[in-house]
Each structure stands twice: as structure tokens, then as C-alpha cells.
């Protein structure tokens, strides 16, 4: 079992680039930078794409340029074109239920109210069985404040924790493709940025 497509969820445009909701895209941006494979806009995939070699595997990167709640359009377009199955897709997204500094891998499950995940599940034929990288951003403590929170920028101290977790997740993704998901998961799930 391998990963052929890594997706970083985001809202498009400079005004959203530094917001918590774009944490998934920060991870894909980091992978692209590390592998000197700049993301380029490809309209047929409704996003920015690139290709990298990860532990000997050919992996495509995607950051949709649709708004978050239409992310599935981009993911389905690329998965269909390259004949990539849902269980060969890793979707990185911001996670309210994890604190900043923590990231976790997960296979399948619901969307937990995340509109990007909701649309991807729908556009993959109601198939939730893709991998996720949950990037912790914390929770504002009141569900009525969630929208403003995810569309806000984290303070510098939280940003550093999120960046450190994203950095560790990128390392663990390479471990996954080289040594298997169990080893990668054990390492990532033991990590907490200080």
C-alpha cells in the first residue's frame, strides 16, 4: 500500500494563506520546497500541483484553488485522471480536536464537520476511506467561535508549534513510504512540539 496523491486543504488567495484553515496546505508547501518541486497552477485539476519522488515512489501534490467546501472537485479530478484509488490518497487538513504542536495520521472515518473533508468524501462517491493527516490547530472553546477561529491567524507562539508538527509530519510521511505506516504513525503520534 502506497500513497500516490497528497492533498493540502486550503482556501485560495493571499488573505487566507496564513489562516489556521490552511494548515494542510502548509504541509504540502513544505514537501514541495524540500523536494525542490514548485507547485504550479493546473486548471484541469482546479489547483496547484507538483510531482515528487518520496522514498522511491512517484507522488503527486495538490493544493486546491477551489474554496474549502469545494475541495472534492480538485481531488476527484486528479484521482480520476491518474487512476488513483481513495486509499492511495493522503489529505492534510486543520484539526480543531488536536492542540497546536500535534499531528496524527488516520485512515477513513467521518468528516467531523470539516467542509473540505465532507466534499472530498462526497466527490469520491461517498467513499471516506482515504488517509488523513490531521494537523492540530486547537479549539476556541465555543462552537459559535469556530468559523472566526479557523479563518484567523494563529499567534506566533502557536504558529511555531504548528510549523514544528508539520515539519515532523513531513519526515514521518517519508518514513511511511520507506518503512511502513505503523512505524510512521508510532513516531508521529509520540511527537508533541514544545
UniProtKB/Swiss-Prot annotation:
The record marks 94 as: Stabilizes the basic form of H active site to accept a proton. SUPFAM superfamilies: Peptidyl-tRNA hydrolase-like (SSF53178). Its main location: cytoplasm. It comes from Klebsiella pneumoniae subsp. pneumoniae (strain ATCC 700721 / MGH 78578). Keywords: Cytoplasm, Hydrolase, RNA-binding, tRNA-binding. One of its GO terms (biological process) is protein quality control for misfolded or incompletely synthesized proteins. This is Peptidyl-tRNA hydrolase. The keyword Hydrolase applies. The keyword Nucleotide-binding does not apply.
Amino acid at each position: 500500500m502506497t500513497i500516490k496523491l497528497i492533498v493540502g486543504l486550503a482556501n485560495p488567495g493571499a488573505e487566507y494563506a496564513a489562516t489556521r484553515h490552511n494548515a494542510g496546505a502548509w504541509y504540502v508547501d513544505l514537501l514541495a520546497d524540500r523536494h525542490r518541486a514548485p507547485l504550479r497552477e493546473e486548471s484541469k485539476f482546479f489547483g496547484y500541483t507538483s510531482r515528487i519522488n518520496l522514498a522511491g515512489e512517484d507522488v503527486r501534490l495538490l493544493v486546491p484553488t477551489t474554496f474549502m467546501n469545494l475541495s472534492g472537485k480538485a481531488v476527484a479530478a486528479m484521482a480520476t485522471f491518474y487512476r488513483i484509488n481513495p486509499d492511495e490518497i493522503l489529505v492534510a487538513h486543520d484539526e480543531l480536536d488536536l492542540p497546536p504542536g500535534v499531528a496524527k495520521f488516520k485512515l477513513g472515518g467521518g468528516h467531523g464537520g470539516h467542509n473540505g473533508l465532507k466534499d472530498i468524501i462526497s466527490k469520491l462517491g461517498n467513499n471516506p476511506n482515504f488517509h488523513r493527516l490531521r494537523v492540530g490547530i486547537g479549539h476556541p472553546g465555543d462552537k459559535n467561535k469556530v468559523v472566526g477561529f479557523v479563518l484567523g491567524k494563529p499567534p506566533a507562539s502557536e504558529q511555531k508549534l504548528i510549523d514544528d508538527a508539520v515539519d515532523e509530519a513531513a519526515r514521518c510521511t517519508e518514513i511511511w513510504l520507506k518503512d511502513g505506516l505503523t512505524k510512521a504513525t508510532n513516531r508521529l503520534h509520540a511527537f508533541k512540539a514544545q
